[in-house]
Amino acid sequence: YLECYLDKGKRTREEEEELITACVISLLADSCGFEYAIPEIDEDISINKVTAEKSWVKLFNNKVGFISNNKSNPELIFPGSFNPIHEGHIKMKELAEKKTGMHTTFEICANNADKPPLTFYEIKRTLDQFQNDESWMLTSAGRFSEKAEMFPNSVFIIGADTLLRVFDEKFYKNYKDMMNHIQRFNDHNINFLVFGRKINKKFISLKNLKVPEIIADRCTGIDEEMFRDDISSTEIRLTNN
């Protein structure tokens, strides 16, 4: 990947776009084994290469369903992009462990249902955040129904906004298809710890959601009095940028 901060006002918008295009072509050519010189400019250009781990390649080639830094079967799973991980995530982890008595495994999906696949750079940057005593796994399970099949008898730590998407019909072929996917939580004994989140400037918790009856008993809410943190990874990224 390439990093460069262009001096504001030094070039027209068109010149900046031409420069960026040339840089992208250079990186693409390099990844294919060809040479294409990066434009010479006054600003500093930093080029960094990330070499994929063999296990990452196996995951993307569907040779394995997941990889992990912990050989134990995960019991308490915290899915997310963690881009970046922040204090709110840590508090959720600690509360969930205290409530369940289980050890948390952070789950990062390389192929989310509603996001582009992660690049090798994004994978490395994300995994490098975790401490040595923290467990993580990288999976190919984009849907929660797929996670349920991959990790039966597990408890998932999720936000109310994520739970809303689990039973949002637009992510499925139709209503029947959605209910078939949701039924897998019963089939594989999956439970959820649901943390409240601010959605459209309003704090929403489990008690505000209409959860399908067939899995309602599998959802346990964490009250606002116990936890509330309105910060999001998206807001942190925007601030840093």
Spell out what each predicted region is.
Residues 5-17, 22-241:
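Nucleotidyltransferase catalytic core that binds NTPs
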